[in-house]
Every structure is written in structure tokens, then in C-alpha cells.
Curated annotation (Swiss-Prot):
Membrane-topology annotation of the record: Multi-pass membrane protein
Keywords: Cell membrane, Membrane, Transmembrane, Transmembrane helix
Gene Ontology cellular-component terms listed: plasma membrane
High-level lineage: Archaea, Methanobacteriati, Methanobacteriota, Methanomada group, Methanococci
Compartments, record wording: Cell membrane
Record field: transmembrane: 13-33, 45-65, 80-100, 116-136
Official protein name in the record: Uncharacterized protein MJ0565
Length: 147
């Protein structure tokens, strides 16, 4: 893979996933702040967690820093793509573990989980975490082809 093609792949992946994580983080923060103020906003996949939104925002910023490095023709741009993807995967793994623990509570018949459903625990964290596998795999391929 030539260096110009790699740069284009890094820029496009970092832009797409940077936008996904940043916009989701901002929406999550806004919903969380409104719920703190007493207004109830419900959107599918969003739970209104301000700190979770900040985590998504941080991952989005890491992707955007990778765009800046790639535009400047810095080979370290792959590192930003790789790092942001790993952090996004970590967020997704945590969301998956929460889903599993809630499912166990439901299966054991705990009272708090009597009305639990799979789609109630399907959050933006889980979706973005699973999507972060795509840039992770591509960054891994790029880093192995440059060595």
C-alpha cells in the first residue's frame, strides 16, 4: 500500500469515526444536562450520561488529531487512529459487560430486572464500541504493512 493511499484511508476513517464519536458525545452530554435540569429527553440508544458523553467526545477528539497528523503527512497518524479505536473498543466492552450483567440479573429473576429487555440496554456506547473494530483492524493492517 503506498503512503498516499494510506494517508487518504487514515484521513477518511478518522473523519468518519471522529464525527460519529464527537456528535454522539455531544448529544449524550446535552441529554444528560437536560435531565439534570429536570427536562426529560428520550432518544433511542442515548442514556443521558454526561461523563459517558465526555468519554465519547475524548475519543472523537483523538480521531480528529489523527486527521491533523495525516494531513501534515506525519506517519504517527496511524497511532492516533489505533489509540482512539482501542479506547472506543474499551467503552464498547464495558457497555457489553453491563448488558451481560443485566441479562444475568433478569435470568436469575431479580426484582430490579423484571422488566429488562435487550433493546433497553442497547446503547450508543455498545454500538460505537463494536463499530470501532473497523478502524482498529485497518490501523493494524496499515501499521503491519509499514514495518
Amino acid at each position: 500500500m503506498d503512503i498516499k493511499n494510506m494517508r487518504n484511508v487514515i484521513v477518511s476513517l478518522s473523519l468518519v469515526f471522529g464525527l460519529l464519536f464527537t456528535v454522539s458525545g455531544i448529544i449524550e452530554i446535552i441529554i444528560g444536562l437536560y435531565s439534570i435540569l429536570g427536562f426529560k429527553i428520550e432518544l433511542p440508544l442515548f442514556v443521558g450520561d454526561v461523563f459517558g458523553g465526555l468519554a465519547l467526545l475524548a475519543v472523537g477528539i483523538a480521531y480528529f488529531l489523527g486527521v491533523k497528523k495525516a494531513v501534515d503527512r506525519d506517519i504517527k497518524a496511524v497511532s492516533y487512529l489505533f489509540t482512539a479505536s482501542i479506547i472506543g473498543l474499551g467503552i464498547g466492552v464495558i457497555a457489553f459487560l453491563i448488558l451481560i450483567s443485566d441479562a444475568i440479573g433478569f435470568l436469575l429473576g431479580f426484582e430490579d430486572w423484571a422488566d429488562w429487555g435487550f433493546f433497553n440496554d442497547l446503547t450508543v456506547y455498545l454500538v460505537l464500541g463494536m463499530l470501532a473494530i473497523i478502524p482498529y483492524r485497518i490501523a493494524k493492517i496499515i501499521s503491519s504493512s509499514t514495518t
